[in-house]
Swiss-Prot record:
Organism: Chaetomium thermophilum (strain DSM 1495 / CBS 144.50 / IMI 039719) (Thermochaetoides thermophila)
Classification via SMART domains: WD40
Record InterPro entries: WD40/YVTN_repeat-like_dom_sf (IPR015943), WD40_repeat_dom_sf (IPR036322), WD40_rpt (IPR001680)
Protein name in the entry: mRNA export factor GLE2
Keyword presence, Repeat: yes
Annotated region (Disordered), positions in chain: 1-31
Record-linked PANTHER family: MRNA EXPORT FACTOR AND BUB3
Gene that produces this protein: GLE2
Ranges of the WD repeats in the UniProt entry: 28-71, 76-115, 117-158, 160-197, 256-295
Membrane topology: Peripheral membrane protein
Length: 357
């Protein structure tokens, strides 16, 4: 069967993945890449990828079925851009960053307008719908999340968090927020201004990323200590919670180098997920079988953001400096690029179910 970037006949059972078919985006950002978002509209025949960067810009690329790509439109903020998300219909993107504001870019007209503001940089922004009404939720270092109806200049609601917001994800009615001091807040968007549940991360070190399951029954947490946790929302499912080590080098002389988990993305169809880290590798996992499906060779730099497209045939990953080694690591020749990995064969398919003991 022909598919993205050619054939999809790869059915190797090896756990070592292949990068030889990966395609680089042309005209990449000029500074570290912070976030990726694909157009989610199933009726749009084309894939569009939005990319936010420390160079103060949001760029939107059109990606053809053979992997060829071109920049379509871009928008500039007044400071580094930390987050970007597509609207459900694929006609607009919303982005936010260090300039303490969120902006909406209309892809057809190229026009941008401010839609949100905080008292400190906005670290996260997500689009969602409330009763069919397009809305956004922003999370800031001012220790609040705010909800925005685009028809109003004032927030539709504000929630005070325990600490600065570092990461956030939305899936259906599930909103998960990760803050400083390892707090994890869970909100049911049917009751958006109160916490459904608050917990301390089961991981002992700083939270880098949270990502909601495809079925919105739970979420994954990644930390700076090369560890990932799988966490279910409801108390009745707590026995299925677990954590595992990842993005760690093979021990040398009893020393293990531990790398941050920078990004976690769930496959939209299979419910399997990826982790990517400061070590420059990404892996695909099956949480239900507690099994690593594929691991990939080092890509030559830290991976700062990842995303699957709407049908899971493309896995995009951003290579750029993540400051995990301080200013000394920020060399002039450090790569800054976005790669498109064609998801072939069984790379992301879950293992056949087996009876649990």
């Amino acid at each position: 069967m022909a598919g993205l970037f050619g054939t999809t006949t790869s059915t190797t059972t090896s756990t070592l993945g292949d990068l030889k078919n990966d395609v680089e985006l042309g005209s990449p950002p000029e500074d570290s890449i912070t976030d990726l978002s694909f157009n989610p509209n199933p009726n749009d025949p084309k894939d569009f990828l939005a990319v936010s960067s420390w160079d103060k810009k949001v760029r939107v690329y059109e990606i053809a079925a053979n992997g060829q790509n071109q920049g379509k439109v871009q928008m500039e903020h007044e400071g580094p851009v930390f987050a970007v998300d597509f609207f459900k219909d694929g006609t607009k993107v919303i982005s936010a960053g260090a300039d303490k504001q969120a902006k909406v870019l209309d892809l057809a007209s190229g026009q941008a307008m401010q839609v949100a503001a905080h008292d400190a940089p906005i670290r996260c922004v997500k689009y969602f719908e409330a009763g069919g009404t397009p809305m956004a939720v922003t999370g800031s270092w001012d220790k609040t999340i705010k909800y925005w109806d685009f028809r109003s200049a004032t927030p539709a609601g504000t929630v005070q968090c325990q600490e600065r917001v570092y990461t956030m994800d939305v899936k259906e009615n599930l909103l998960v927020i990760g803050t400083a001091d390892r707090y994890i807040d869970v909100i049911n968007l049917k009751e958006p201004v109160k916490f459904y549940k608050t917990l301390q991360s089961p991981l002992k070190w700083q939270t880098r990323v949270v990502s909601c399951f495809t079925d919105s029954q739970g979420f994954a947490i990644g930390s700076i200590e090369g560890r990932c946790a799988i966490q279910y929302v409801e108390d009745k499912d707590q026995s299925m919670n677990f954590s595992f080590k990842c993005h760690r080098d093979t021990p040398q002389n009893n020393v293990t180098n531990v790398h941050a988990v920078n990004a976690i993305s769930f496959h939209p169809q299979h419910g399997t997920f990826s982790t990517a880290g400061s070590d420059g590798t990404f892996h695909f996992w099956d949480k239900d079988a507690k099994h690593r499906l594929k691991g990939y060779p080092n890509v030559g730099g830290s991976i700062t953001a990842t995303k699957f497209n709407r049908n899971g045939t493309i896995f995009a990953y951003a290579i750029s400096y993540d400051w995990s080694k301080g200013y000394q690591g920020n060399t002039a020749n450090y790569p800054t690029k976005v790669m498109l990995h064609p998801v072939l064969g069984d790379e992301c398919k879950p293992r056949p179910s087996v009876k649990k003991r």
